[in-house]
A protein has these predicted regions:
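Terminal low-complexity/charged segments
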Residues: 1-126
């Protein structure tokens, strides 16, 4: 509801989604998503944050801001945050069969992926 309001309200006109970022708090309120919007006509910006527990879902805004589609997929892929009513919520960076979400604080890097060793630190490629 807020998303539709801030784009349609003539005093706000937030027509540009600058950034949508996920984060892991590692607490009972587990995850958050920060939304940064800009009004190209009125030259102002705003940030909204939503914080949720690990099982909750966040409503997708991809139907309002088309660029949110890929932003939400990236947050899903790296944090496992689910966006309800997303048109095609699936991994965007990692392979479909990758286990886990690597930017979560509790993520454990697997030793192997499809028989190949997975580097655990930068000494592997230095």
């Amino acid at each position: 509801k807020i998303a539709a309001y801030i784009i349609q309200n003539n005093n706000l006109k937030f027509d540009y989604l600058m950034c949508l970022s996920g984060y892991d708090l590692g607490e009972s309120i587990r995850f958050g998503v920060a939304y940064n919007f800009y009004s190209t006509s009125l030259k102002h910006y705003i940030e909204f944050r939503i914080e949720i527990d690990a099982e909750a879902q966040i409503p997708s805004i991809a139907q309002i801001w088309k660029t949110a589609n890929w932003h939400e997929r990236e947050v899903y892929d790296l944090f496992g945050i689910t966006f309800s009513n997303h048109p095609k919520l699936k991994r965007i960076l990692l392979p479909e069969d990758w286990e886990g979400h690597p930017l979560r604080k509790d993520y454990k890097t697997p030793e192997y992926y499809n028989g190949m060793p997975v580097p655990k630190d930068k000494s592997y490629w230095e």
